Amino acid sequence: MRQTQKEKLLPEQTAEKIRGYIEGNGLKVGDKLPNEFQLAEICGVGRSTVREAIKLLVFSGKVEVIRGSGTYIK
């Protein structure tokens, strides 16, 4: 089954929601994102989906994860 341009996987949709959260809340470079539990609640998804979405955002250069500290806007 081919994915059409309009259909996006849940982690991709969640990454877009997180981008919207960043822009909608005026977060700047260096600001810390909420933790996985909070992002899951904000986005209405599970933590594993949030983790996948964060990986996409890391790959795109939007955020960086500092182990033991959190996820920060890049």
Question: What is each of the regions a protein language model found here?
Answer:
Residues 1-74:
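Short linear motifs at protein or domain termini
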